[in-house]
């Protein structure tokens, strides 16, 4: 089956067959009393955000939707609906888009989306994926959100740095294949490669916290590295932030691969990006409840007085200022 046989409308209708979603659904559910709307947008471009030489289309679809719902979770809200526009390049036809869509549907079902909209448009510059995600936040939970304080705990939802190492391994493998026609052996590093190709976010983490009466004082999605999150945290709270190098979680053989690629895993965690982990700050009085009931999260640091800034604390106790691409350094700001 090809686009030339069924056309755009027929293709969209065919893609929805066997899914719990409806094609051309004019979704507009009213918010429940006591809720407020949250919306986020994301654009993903071939050659910038993904490389189809090695990226399985089903994984790409799954990852795209995961990123969209992750943005909603990072707003301390629950995802409800997503509208997707796929820009289809000339080298792709219906079977490839079907594979991409299948991954999107899997992720949408995992996160309980009530609506998944789709449009297909032609693209002259490679595959593109535009996401518009909406969700809701309980007004009572918003009102209960505490003001960030020094000593609030900084918590992350899973290992960091693996995505960048996985990306680097795939890029190296693609280059080697182009040069020598030898396929890379990725079996030893499946978890690390998977962290880049198919990141996962725990769908019920926010609900668990709400049920336990744990209300984060701040929340972020680590998409550009932990350093970027800490910079945002310091800016938004007016406080300092300390993260301890020996508390950062890593996948099992991250350091082995880091040595092979000559990449420091701590640097990958801070500046690599693409991990798509949730980062919360939690009042220190909730530490025991949090540790006991949300064991997939790791406590990696805490907020501090504002003169501290954003720092990484080494195992020897040395505090190193954190820098992130896209942010002006303190020295630059003083000029």
Language-model features: locations:
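Helix-biased detector of long, well-ordered alpha-helical tracts
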Residues: 1-335
């Amino acid at each position: 089956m090809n686009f030339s046989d069924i056309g755009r409308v027929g293709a969209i209708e065919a893609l929805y067959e066997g899914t719990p979603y409806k094609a051309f659904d004019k979704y507009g559910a009213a918010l429940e009393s006591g809720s407020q709307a949250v919306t986020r947008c994301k654009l993903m471009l071939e050659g910038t955000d993904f490389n189809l030489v090695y990226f399985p289309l089903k994984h790409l679809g799954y990852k795209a939707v995961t990123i969209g719902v992750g943005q909603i979770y990072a707003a301390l809200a629950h995802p409800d609906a997503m509208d997707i526009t796929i820009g289809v390049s000339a080298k792709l036809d219906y079977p490839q888009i079907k594979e991409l869509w299948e991954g999107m549907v899997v992720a949408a079902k995992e996160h309980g989306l009530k609506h998944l909209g789709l449009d297909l448009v032609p693209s002259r510059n490679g595959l593109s994926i535009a996401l518009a995600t909406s969700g809701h936040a309980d007004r009572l939970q918003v009102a209960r959100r505490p003001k960030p304080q020094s000593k609030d705990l900084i918590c992350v939802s899973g290992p960091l740095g693996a995505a960048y190492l996985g990306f680097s391994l795939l890029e190296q493998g693609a280059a080697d294949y182009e040069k020598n026609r030898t396929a890379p052996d990725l079996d030893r590093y499946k978890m690390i490669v998977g962290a880049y190709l198919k990141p996962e976010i725990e769908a019920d983490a926010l609900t668990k916290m709400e049920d336990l009466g744990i209300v984060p004082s701040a929340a972020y999605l680590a998409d550009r590295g932990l350093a970027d999150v800490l910079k945002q945290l310091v800016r938004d709270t007016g406080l300092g932030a300390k993260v301890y190098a020996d508390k950062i979680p890593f996948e099992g053989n991250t350091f082995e691969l880091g040595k092979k690629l000559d990449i420091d895993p701590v640097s990958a965690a801070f500046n690599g990006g693409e991990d798509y982990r949730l980062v919360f700050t939690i009042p220190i009085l909730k530490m025991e409840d949090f540790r006991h009931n949300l064991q997939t999260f790791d406590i990696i640091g805490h907020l501090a007085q504002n003169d501290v800034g954003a720092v990484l604390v080494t195992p020897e106790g040395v505090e190193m200022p954190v820098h992130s691409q896209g942010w002006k350094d303190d020295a630059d700001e003083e000029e």
